[in-house]
Curated annotation (Swiss-Prot):
A Pfam match: MoeA_C
Cellular component, GO annotation: cytosol
Top-level EC class as recorded in UniProt: transferase
InterPro entries registered for this protein in UniProt: MoaB/Mog-like_dom_sf, MoaB/Mog_dom, MoeA-like, MoeA_C_domain_IV, MoeA_C_domain_IV_sf, MoeA_linker/N, MoeA_linker/N_sf
Lineage top rank: taxon: Bacteria
Alphabetic keyword roster: Magnesium, Metal-binding, Molybdenum, Molybdenum cofactor biosynthesis, Transferase
Entry's EC annotation: 2.10.1.1
Pathway the protein contributes to: Cofactor biosynthesis; molybdopterin biosynthesis
Molecular functions per Gene Ontology: metal ion binding; molybdopterin molybdotransferase activity
Catalytic activity annotation: adenylyl-molybdopterin + molybdate = Mo-molybdopterin + AMP + H(+)
Protein name (record): Molybdopterin molybdenumtransferase
Amino acid sequence: MSVEKRTPISVKEAIKRIMKQHVEVKNININLDESLGHILAEDIVATYDIPRFNKSPYDGFAIRSEDSQGASGENRIEFEVIDHIGAGSVSEKTIDKNQAIRIMTGAQIPSGADAVVMFEQTIESETTFTIRKSFKHLENISLQGEEIKAGDIVLHKGMRINSGVIAVLATYGYTKVRVARKPTVAVIATGSELLEVEDELEPGKIRNSNGPMIKALAKQFGIQVGMYKVQHDNLEKSIEVVKKALSEHDLVITTGGVSVGDFDYLPEIYKSIQAQILFNKVAQRPGSVTTVAFADGKYLFGLSGNPSACYTGFELYVKPAVNKLMGAKACYPQIIKATLMEDFNKANPFTRLIRAKATLTKAGMTVIPSGFNKSGAVVAIAHANAMIMLPGGTRGFKAGNIVDVILTESNSFEEELIL
């Protein structure tokens, strides 16, 4: 097999090439209690104000503010309590001069009242109370529509549904929600050196760790994963299984077979299914031979067989694509600044991604490499919740330097690519 010359592109350009492809986002209706983690497929318009009515934010007494004018420590003003209302109840009485209604948090302000006195601001007797300060018009009142007005867009298409979104949907009576259907992902590990997880070890062999790892990463999105048997280095069989996976799923991820060795068949597989190669080399370490193709409106990700490189490829390239397929408005990795806690002296001819442990402290975010830092590392991934991103063309970072970090355990994404 002839060795193909590959021209590397930047990480940013690689992500752009993935995201510019046109993909079909299919919408479905699901039950509200099944919608967590999905993406809204339509704007949600408020059908009424929030709050729906003027209400009390405190336990206290509803009064007319004009009756409190002139109150002081030397001139306490007395009010007669004529009713008592809790949240969900409405008083039928109208407050007159120096009258008050005992009111609980969330209850509707009764007719005639325009202020609320908190219990702790009063001295109570059996049917009366006194105050020593005056109150302004609408003091201590939550006003109708102060948060949302009827007709406002309260939730936007492309938002990820979290607990707060579910609260809003429930508020407006949505038992069914229009969402983007989550894609299904096929995972295929390749390589004659691979054994299944349950197999006994043999000389020169390793167990397939990438397949279960990719499955777990995909399931963090709550998407269905189809696992295919480990494919050994046989071109015809590999082509057959990739075609099958492509016909059964929305996205195909293979691990291994992306390098330039005699048994790395991915270029031939893509050629046989007439896939468009978006890129096959990225100026990054690890994972420089990450390859992404597009066929029949579907992505094919060829990730490295080295575990850390495979993990890096999923975080950088698969996640934005899955977000796009889910109809998300925010698709891109969230990058933050953190203080490096130990020296990293290795040269970085290309963008370097380091598995790391990020910690939020009182002084801010800190980050430290999580262990052995080579592309084949496995254990370092288990202790990582982040990736340090060091720019190409640099050499030597010292403890105390500020570095870019991707929080890999975060479910927050950016609308713009900020690499």
